[in-house]
Structures are given as structure tokens and as C-alpha cells.
Amino acid sequence: MLGVRCLLRSVRFCSSAPFPKHKPSAKLSVRDALGAQNASGERIKIQGWIRSVRSQKEVLFLHVNDGSSLESLQVVADSGLDSRELNFGSSVEVQGQLIKSPSKRQNVELKAEKIKVIGNCDAKDFPIKYKERHPLEYLRQYPHFRCRTNVLGSILRIRSEATAAIHSFFKDSGFVHIHTPIITSNDSEGAGELFQLEPSGKLKVPEENFFNVPAFLTVSGQLHLEVMSGAFTQVFTFGPTFRAENSQSRRHLAEFYMIEAEISFVDSLQDLMQVIEELFKATTMMVLSKCPEDVELCHKFIAPGQKDRLEHMLKNNFLIISYTEAVEILKQASQNFTFTPEWGADLRTEHEKYLVKHCGNIPVFVINYPLTLKPFYMRDNEDGPQHTVAAVDLLVPGVGELFGGGLREERYHFLEERLARSGLTEVYQWYLDLRRFGSVPHGGFGMGFERYLQCILGVDNIKDVIPFPRFPHSCLL
């Protein structure tokens, strides 16, 4: 009997009987409200932050934004409404009817029936001021508030769309996404610019390592991707990387995001360069199609003329020159460089930017670098006295180096000799073992995500394209 009563009770709760006739307002994002095809008085609810307040004799106008779009939704309310807390920056919930707007400035507007202030904002003390276009340098002081400005909001939406576009490109191309570790015992760059990890508090034990070996924040996921490329022919990762570089330049951060890929069974740089160019162009085209208003805002207020420069990059095939040719171009330049170009020396930022300009402001691949300039895993070209490796960098306008990559040394004895000369054989024995068991020709590349955003948007300082920039002597929040 008890079972029957429980069954009847459950049937009652699962009944298809209608709810009370009161129809709640449909919650919409500002973007969806602005894009509504039928603005015939549907009752809706939006939540967001006030971007502007304008009071007239009989009508009160608000513009409310929730971050879903650059454009705000105009809210029209009776002027008799208590507006004391309806300040710039206050968070609100608005219910009302979505109607066609009589103004040519917007297609729809929300006729408010109820406005609820969720959180008041004292506009006098708020560091972001109404109708004031703050310099990006000023906004860096307020990482907890700068996302509320139009420019940073646009950059962060573009960042989100670019992330999705990159994942989409790799998925459509048959790549497997690998989560490479943040904590590692390897230094894939060989530069020694590492953040070492130590436990704090009671776990801190002198003369011992938590992992029994020194551990660091990763500088690259490449070596772990190479492990995976022995089982999957195409792999990629997208995540944070860390460099303990004491640099305050406009291109460097201590924490940034990297897109890295490894491809098995490739034996030419041309194969890698084709994927790199396709990735850059496909991602950029997707960003331009998904958030044109945000890109337009950045180009208008941050980098006038960037739209034309970007279109120039997209419509032209990327160029290819060798490192040796690059050095000759620099030597013949009329420009005086701070660092004298010479064969065997690394290309500096001033050199990279000159080479791009020399090539008509089209992205240019520089290939076949001196062996001494690149890490131990780059494939030896066996090309005589100059001794180069099959490495490639992509240089782009305004930024310089954007991609770096190359063919990996898959031949056991070549790699063994390189490691022995560097005294790294014991540390990288596992890496050597990959060449003993089913090794294949393979190669890969990495792209700095923040530099990519700088490139397409024309943002001069890398600190302005990441939500919370980390750099020497600064770790706000």
C-alpha cells in the first residue's frame, strides 16, 4: 500500500497539468534581445550593468550591457521611477516588453515594467569614468575593472572567439587535443628561464623535492606532444606557459598562452608551413566573421589602418626566405640597427620587423637557422660548413616572430651525439628511447596566442590582450 501511495505521489509531481497562467519573463542576453526578429511586445528579462543614464522630462533612458555584445540595449522607463541608484556601473535586472524602437539608432528597445538594482555603483569613486576613453596604460592599474570598458570587452570577446576558432581548425583537420602538464621536470626550450616549484608551509622540507626531482612550471608542451605523436599522427595543445624572463618589453609576459602542434610522418618544412599559414588565415577569417563590431572598434581606436594591413596579409601567400638570405638583406639595409646583423647571431626584434617591411608587410617564413641557435631536438640539415637545422620562424607585421617550429631530429645517433655534447644524455634518456621504438619523421610548431591577438588587432602592448598580465615586478590579483 505504501508503494502505491508513493507511486501516486510521484505521478502527481510528474503530472503534465499546466502551471499557473502567469507567464514569467523570458531571460535573454543583450545580444539575443538586440537580434530578436519579432519585437512585438514579448515580455523579457535582462541582467547587466548600466553603461549610461539619461533622464528627460517624462522618460528615463538606460543603456544596459551584459558583455554578450559590444552594443548595449536601450531601456526606456517612466521618469517617475526612483533613479537614485541607477548609476553608471550599477548592476540591474530589468523586466519589460521588447518593442520596436522609433529611433534609427537601434532596432529594438526594452519598455521597462520593473527595474531592480542588484548592486549599486558609486560613480564618483569608480575608477572607470562615464564617457571617458581611458588610455590602455591607465586601465592596466585596474585589472579587476578594465574588463568593463568597451575596448577591453571587445578584446576579450575576440580572444574567446579566436580560442574557439583555433580549436575548430584543429578538430576539422583531424588533430587530437592533448592536455599537456603544467608541472614538468623538462626544459624544452633549453634556455633555463624557468619558475621552479617548491611546496609552502608544513610541506616544505629542506634538501628534498616534493616530486623527488626538481619541478618547474612548463615553458612548452612540445616534448610531451612528441610523446603523443608516437601514437597519434596529429596532436595539439593550447594552454598556459611560463617564462622567468626579466623583460619589460611590449612582446613578453611571464605567463602567456601557447598553441602547439606536432605532426608525424612529415619530412619537409613545407608541410609545416602550409599548416601554419592555414591556421593563421582560418582563425583570422573566423574572428572577422564572428565579431566584426569588436574588431572594428579595436581597429578604429587602437590601430587606425590595421584593417587594410590585415586584409593585405590574408589575401597574399606568405613568403619564404632562408636565414642566410635574411642576414644578407639586413647587411645591405640602409637602416642602422642597434645590433649588427651577422651570420650565426640570433635575429633581434628590430631585424624581424625590418625583414617583414622589406617583404612588403606580408608574413614571411625564415627557415634553416644555424645549428647553434636552436635547441638540441631540431633536425640537422647536414649542409656542410654552415651547419644549419630545419627550423622555421614566421615573422608578421607589427610583432616580429609569431610562430616557431621545425622538423625534429628523429635519427637516434644524431640526437644521441647532440645530447652528449650538451651533457644532457641522462636527463633525456626517455626522449632518446622514443627514437629506438617506432620512431618516425615528425615536426611541429608553436604560436604565442597573445602575439597573435596583437598582430590581428594592432595592439602595441601584449599586456593589453590578456585578462590578467603577469610580468616582472607585477602580479596584480
Curated annotation (Swiss-Prot):
Disulfide bonds: none
Signal peptide range in chain numbering: none
Mutation effect (residue 213 to F): In DFNB94; uncertain significance; unable to rescue mitochondrial respiratory chain defects in NARS2 null fibroblasts; does not affect homodimerization; does not affect localization to mitochondrion
Organism listed in the record: Homo sapiens
PROSITE patterns documented for this protein: AA_TRNA_LIGASE_II (PS50862)
Keyword Translocase: no
Compartments (UniProt record): Mitochondrion matrix; Mitochondrion
Role description: Mitochondrial aminoacyl-tRNA synthetase that catalyzes the specific attachment of the asparagine amino acid (aa) to the homologous transfer RNA (tRNA), further participating in protein synthesis. The reaction occurs in a two steps: asparagine is first activated by ATP to form Asn-AMP and then transferred to the acceptor end of tRNA(Asn).
N6-acetyllysine: modified positions: 353
Keywords tagged on the record: Acetylation, Aminoacyl-tRNA synthetase, ATP-binding, Deafness, Disease variant, Leigh syndrome, Ligase, Mitochondrion, Non-syndromic deafness, Nucleotide-binding, Primary mitochondrial disease, Protein biosynthesis, Transit peptide
GO molecular function: asparagine-tRNA ligase activity; ATP binding; nucleic acid binding
Name of this chain's protein: Asparaginyl-tRNA synthetase
Family of this protein: Belongs to the class-II aminoacyl-tRNA synthetase family.
Reactions performed catalytically: tRNA(Asn) + L-asparagine + ATP = L-asparaginyl-tRNA(Asn) + AMP + diphosphate + H(+)
Transit peptide, residue positions per record: 1-14
NCBIfam families on file: asnS, PRK03932.1
Keyword Transit peptide belongs to the record: yes
A cellular-component GO term for this protein: mitochondrion
Pfam families, per the entry: tRNA-synt_2, tRNA_anti-codon
